[in-house]
């Protein structure tokens, strides 16, 4: 009977969210039933989480798109965009992941998680055949990691780890010296969608 009681379903979702149990089958069932009865941004996001757990990433994107059409506050909007960007990254669609992470930053420019995600997307970009230029994406990725820790100190540890990981792949000074498109110390614009 409670599967048709929107108030009970909402209470269940609220309780499980407060307890940090949004990965439980009970939470998913409540979100799915609530979404069927009376769709809200919260129920759509709950259904998206269920899809992610089942690795139904296309379904998760669709539910996040629904959530975004119903959301009534900027904080949740930015969070849904961030989560949707993560889904695109899980799908290895880094270009779309970066685009959605940028949309999240347009809503909340202080969310360091989005800059970390942008950096990961850029580091995963395959935009050059040239082996030296292909590594130029790591410069931009590390710029994003630095930006993450500059705007959001809670991201500092993750940002520092990512910088340490990806900076080791920068083109060497010798590579830069011998490459006609690069000059040490000069600005360089990474092409493609990055």
Residue ranges and their predicted role:
Residues 1-3, 31-40, 66-74, 103-108:
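Solenoid-like repeat scaffolds
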